[in-house]
Protein backbone atom coordinates (compact mmCIF):
# COMPACT_ATOMS: atom_id res chain seq x y z
CA UNK A 1 0.00 0.00 0.00
CA UNK A 2 0.99 3.61 -0.58
CA UNK A 3 0.29 6.86 1.22
CA UNK A 4 -0.36 9.09 -1.77
CA UNK A 5 -0.95 12.80 -1.52
CA UNK A 6 -3.07 12.77 -4.67
CA UNK A 7 -4.98 10.12 -6.60
CA UNK A 8 -6.43 11.34 -9.91
CA UNK A 9 -9.07 9.24 -11.67
CA UNK A 10 -9.99 9.43 -15.34
CA UNK A 11 -12.45 7.47 -17.44
CA UNK A 12 -9.81 7.17 -20.17
CA UNK A 13 -6.08 7.73 -20.28
CA UNK A 14 -5.59 11.38 -21.37
CA UNK A 15 -8.54 12.65 -19.26
CA UNK A 16 -6.33 13.50 -16.30
CA UNK A 17 -3.73 15.18 -18.50
CA UNK A 18 -6.39 17.32 -20.20
CA UNK A 19 -7.96 18.45 -16.95
CA UNK A 20 -5.06 18.73 -14.54
CA UNK A 21 -1.76 17.84 -16.19
CA UNK A 22 -0.21 21.13 -15.14
CA UNK A 23 -1.38 20.70 -11.56
CA UNK A 24 0.05 17.19 -11.37
CA UNK A 25 3.41 18.46 -12.60
CA UNK A 26 3.21 21.26 -10.01
CA UNK A 27 2.45 18.79 -7.21
CA UNK A 28 5.39 16.65 -8.30
CA UNK A 29 7.67 19.71 -8.19
CA UNK A 30 6.46 20.19 -4.62
CA UNK A 31 7.54 16.59 -3.91
CA UNK A 32 4.00 15.32 -3.50
CA UNK A 33 3.26 11.67 -4.23
CA UNK A 34 0.82 11.60 -7.17
CA UNK A 35 -0.93 8.57 -8.64
CA UNK A 36 -3.24 8.22 -11.63
CA UNK A 37 -5.94 5.62 -12.28
CA UNK A 38 -7.63 5.12 -15.66
CA UNK A 39 -10.94 3.29 -15.26
CA UNK A 40 -11.14 1.90 -18.81
CA UNK A 41 -8.70 0.92 -21.54
CA UNK A 42 -10.44 3.36 -23.92
CA UNK A 43 -11.00 0.42 -26.23
CA UNK A 44 -13.73 2.23 -28.17
CA UNK A 45 -11.64 5.27 -29.06
CA UNK A 46 -11.86 6.15 -32.75
CA UNK A 47 -8.07 6.25 -33.14
CA UNK A 48 -5.21 4.15 -31.82
CA UNK A 49 -5.25 0.76 -30.13
CA UNK A 50 -5.39 -0.37 -26.51
CA UNK A 51 -1.72 -1.36 -26.51
CA UNK A 52 -0.60 1.91 -28.10
CA UNK A 53 -2.76 3.94 -25.72
CA UNK A 54 -1.09 2.22 -22.75
CA UNK A 55 2.34 3.13 -24.12
CA UNK A 56 1.26 6.73 -24.62
CA UNK A 57 -0.24 6.87 -21.12
CA UNK A 58 2.98 5.56 -19.59
CA UNK A 59 4.98 8.23 -21.42
CA UNK A 60 2.57 10.98 -20.36
CA UNK A 61 2.81 9.88 -16.72
CA UNK A 62 6.60 9.89 -17.00
CA UNK A 63 6.58 13.43 -18.39
CA UNK A 64 4.40 14.68 -15.53
CA UNK A 65 6.39 12.74 -12.93
CA UNK A 66 3.51 10.68 -11.52
CA UNK A 67 4.64 8.00 -9.08
CA UNK A 68 2.29 5.34 -10.40
CA UNK A 69 -0.37 4.81 -13.06
CA UNK A 70 -3.00 2.13 -12.51
CA UNK A 71 -5.05 0.68 -15.37
CA UNK A 72 -8.47 -0.81 -14.62
CA UNK A 73 -10.49 -2.66 -17.25
CA UNK A 74 -14.01 -1.37 -16.73
CA UNK A 75 -15.86 -1.21 -20.07
CA UNK A 76 -15.49 1.89 -22.22
CA UNK A 77 -18.99 3.39 -22.65
CA UNK A 78 -20.11 0.98 -19.94
CA UNK A 79 -19.32 2.89 -16.76
CA UNK A 80 -22.60 2.04 -15.10
CA UNK A 81 -23.26 1.88 -11.38
CA UNK A 82 -22.47 -1.66 -10.27
CA UNK A 83 -21.05 -3.38 -7.22
CA UNK A 84 -18.18 -4.81 -9.26
CA UNK A 85 -17.13 -1.41 -10.61
CA UNK A 86 -17.35 0.27 -7.20
CA UNK A 87 -15.41 -2.57 -5.58
CA UNK A 88 -12.61 -2.25 -8.15
CA UNK A 89 -12.28 1.48 -7.47
CA UNK A 90 -12.45 1.00 -3.70
CA UNK A 91 -9.51 -1.40 -4.01
CA UNK A 92 -7.47 1.26 -5.82
CA UNK A 93 -8.32 3.89 -3.20
CA UNK A 94 -7.33 1.57 -0.36
CA UNK A 95 -4.08 0.62 -2.10
CA UNK A 96 -3.11 4.24 -2.79
CA UNK A 97 -4.58 5.70 0.45
CA UNK A 98 -4.67 9.28 -0.88
CA UNK A 99 -5.26 12.49 1.03
CA UNK A 100 -7.05 14.00 -1.97
CA UNK A 101 -8.94 12.47 -4.88
CA UNK A 102 -9.53 14.25 -8.19
CA UNK A 103 -12.08 13.12 -10.79
CA UNK A 104 -13.81 14.50 -13.90
CA UNK A 105 -16.42 17.24 -13.51
CA UNK A 106 -19.87 15.79 -14.13
CA UNK A 107 -21.02 18.42 -16.64
CA UNK A 108 -19.28 17.15 -19.76
CA UNK A 109 -20.33 16.26 -23.31
CA UNK A 110 -18.95 12.71 -22.89
CA UNK A 111 -21.22 10.56 -20.67
CA UNK A 112 -18.28 8.43 -19.50
CA UNK A 113 -16.77 11.40 -17.69
CA UNK A 114 -19.83 12.11 -15.57
CA UNK A 115 -20.40 8.40 -14.98
CA UNK A 116 -16.79 8.02 -13.88
CA UNK A 117 -17.29 10.76 -11.29
CA UNK A 118 -20.45 9.09 -9.97
CA UNK A 119 -18.63 5.77 -9.57
CA UNK A 120 -15.62 7.34 -7.86
CA UNK A 121 -17.88 9.25 -5.44
CA UNK A 122 -19.59 6.00 -4.46
CA UNK A 123 -16.22 4.28 -4.07
CA UNK A 124 -14.84 7.07 -1.87
CA UNK A 125 -17.76 6.60 0.51
CA UNK A 126 -17.49 2.80 0.53
CA UNK A 127 -13.69 2.90 0.97
CA UNK A 128 -14.21 4.46 4.39
CA UNK A 129 -16.57 1.74 5.63
CA UNK A 130 -14.67 -0.79 7.74
CA UNK A 131 -16.98 -3.71 6.95
CA UNK A 132 -17.02 -3.06 3.20
CA UNK A 133 -14.93 -5.74 1.50
CA UNK A 134 -12.84 -4.81 -1.52
CA UNK A 135 -11.10 -7.23 -3.89
CA UNK A 136 -8.08 -7.62 -1.59
CA UNK A 137 -9.68 -7.22 1.87
CA UNK A 138 -7.64 -4.07 2.57
CA UNK A 139 -8.21 -1.80 5.58
CA UNK A 140 -10.68 1.08 5.23
CA UNK A 141 -9.45 4.50 4.15
CA UNK A 142 -11.19 7.87 4.42
CA UNK A 143 -10.35 10.45 1.74
CA UNK A 144 -9.99 13.95 3.20
CA UNK A 145 -10.42 16.10 0.07
CA UNK A 146 -12.47 15.58 -3.10
CA UNK A 147 -12.05 17.73 -6.21
CA UNK A 148 -13.25 17.77 -9.82
CA UNK A 149 -11.28 18.81 -12.90
CA UNK A 150 -12.66 19.87 -16.29
CA UNK A 151 -12.13 17.94 -19.49
CA UNK A 152 -14.49 19.34 -22.14
CA UNK A 153 -16.08 22.76 -22.03
CA UNK A 154 -15.58 25.91 -20.04
CA UNK A 155 -17.18 26.36 -16.63
CA UNK A 156 -16.83 28.86 -13.80
CA UNK A 157 -14.63 26.94 -11.31
CA UNK A 158 -14.63 27.13 -7.54
CA UNK A 159 -10.90 27.82 -7.64
CA UNK A 160 -7.90 27.74 -9.97
CA UNK A 161 -4.31 26.57 -9.58
CA UNK A 162 -1.47 28.52 -11.18
CA UNK A 163 0.28 26.29 -13.75
CA UNK A 164 2.35 28.98 -15.45
CA UNK A 165 5.54 27.07 -14.62
CA UNK A 166 4.17 23.69 -15.72
CA UNK A 167 2.07 24.45 -18.80
CA UNK A 168 4.82 23.08 -21.04
CA UNK A 169 4.83 19.77 -19.14
CA UNK A 170 1.06 19.61 -19.57
CA UNK A 171 1.33 20.19 -23.32
CA UNK A 172 4.12 17.64 -23.63
CA UNK A 173 2.04 15.06 -21.77
CA UNK A 174 -0.87 15.65 -24.15
CA UNK A 175 1.40 15.41 -27.18
CA UNK A 176 2.49 11.99 -25.89
CA UNK A 177 -0.96 10.81 -27.05
CA UNK A 178 -0.08 11.05 -30.71
CA UNK A 179 -2.82 8.60 -31.68
CA UNK A 180 -5.46 10.84 -30.11
CA UNK A 181 -4.41 14.41 -30.83
CA UNK A 182 -2.15 14.38 -33.88
CA UNK A 183 -3.96 13.61 -37.16
CA UNK A 184 -2.43 11.19 -39.63
CA UNK A 185 -3.49 9.87 -43.03
CA UNK A 186 -5.11 6.87 -41.33
CA UNK A 187 -6.80 8.65 -38.43
CA UNK A 188 -10.51 9.34 -38.05
CA UNK A 189 -11.44 13.00 -37.67
CA UNK A 190 -12.64 13.67 -34.12
CA UNK A 191 -12.81 16.73 -31.84
CA UNK A 192 -9.45 15.62 -30.45
CA UNK A 193 -7.68 15.71 -33.82
CA UNK A 194 -8.92 19.21 -34.66
CA UNK A 195 -6.83 21.57 -32.57
CA UNK A 196 -7.94 20.17 -29.21
CA UNK A 197 -4.63 20.79 -27.41
CA UNK A 198 -4.69 24.40 -28.58
CA UNK A 199 -8.26 24.75 -27.27
CA UNK A 200 -7.24 23.38 -23.87
CA UNK A 201 -4.25 25.72 -23.76
CA UNK A 202 -6.51 28.67 -24.60
CA UNK A 203 -8.87 27.71 -21.77
CA UNK A 204 -6.05 27.57 -19.24
CA UNK A 205 -4.77 30.89 -20.61
CA UNK A 206 -8.18 32.45 -19.97
CA UNK A 207 -8.39 31.03 -16.45
CA UNK A 208 -4.92 32.40 -15.83
CA UNK A 209 -5.88 35.84 -17.11
CA UNK A 210 -8.93 35.90 -14.84
CA UNK A 211 -6.72 34.99 -11.85
CA UNK A 212 -3.85 37.33 -12.70
CA UNK A 213 -1.33 34.70 -13.80
CA UNK A 214 -0.27 33.36 -17.19
CA UNK A 215 -1.95 29.94 -17.06
CA UNK A 216 -4.25 28.23 -14.57
CA UNK A 217 -6.39 25.09 -14.33
CA UNK A 218 -9.90 25.27 -12.89
CA UNK A 219 -11.41 22.95 -10.29
CA UNK A 220 -14.52 22.33 -8.25
CA UNK A 221 -14.52 21.27 -4.61
CA UNK A 222 -17.01 18.88 -3.00
CA UNK A 223 -16.79 20.91 0.20
CA UNK A 224 -16.43 24.60 0.95
CA UNK A 225 -12.78 25.65 0.76
CA UNK A 226 -10.76 27.23 3.57
CA UNK A 227 -8.03 29.38 2.01
CA UNK A 228 -4.43 29.22 3.23
CA UNK A 229 -4.03 32.97 2.72
CA UNK A 230 -6.25 35.92 3.47
CA UNK A 231 -8.21 37.95 0.96
CA UNK A 232 -5.42 40.54 0.78
CA UNK A 233 -2.97 37.92 -0.44
CA UNK A 234 -0.75 37.70 2.62
CA UNK A 235 0.17 34.50 4.41
CA UNK A 236 -1.75 33.79 7.59
UniProtKB/Swiss-Prot annotation:
Record has Acetylation as a keyword: no
Role summary: Involved in bacillithiol (BSH) biosynthesis. Catalyzes the second step of the pathway, the deacetylation of N-acetylglucosaminylmalate (GlcNAc-Mal) to glucosamine malate (GlcN-Mal).
EC code: 3.5.1.-
Annotated Zn(2+) binding sites: 12, 15, 113
Gene3D superfamilies named among the record's database cross-references: LmbE-like
Spans traversing the lipid bilayer: none
Gene label: bshB1
Disruption phenotype: Mutant shows a 2-fold reduction in bacillithiol levels. BshB1/bshB2 double mutant does not produce bacillithiol.
PANTHER family (alphabetical): N-ACETYL-ALPHA-D-GLUCOSAMINYL L-MALATE DEACETYLASE 1, N-ACETYLGLUCOSAMINYL-PHOSPHATIDYLINOSITOL DE-N-ACETYLASE-RELATED
Enzyme class: hydrolase
Name under which the protein is recorded: N-acetyl-alpha-D-glucosaminyl L-malate deacetylase 1
Amino acid sequence: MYNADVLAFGAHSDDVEIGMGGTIAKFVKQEKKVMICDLTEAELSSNGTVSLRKEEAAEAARILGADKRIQLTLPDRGLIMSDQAIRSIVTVIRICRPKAVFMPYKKDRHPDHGNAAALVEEAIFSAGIHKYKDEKSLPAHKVSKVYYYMINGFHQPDFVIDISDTIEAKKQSLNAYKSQFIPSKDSVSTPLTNGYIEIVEAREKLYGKEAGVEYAEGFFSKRMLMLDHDVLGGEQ
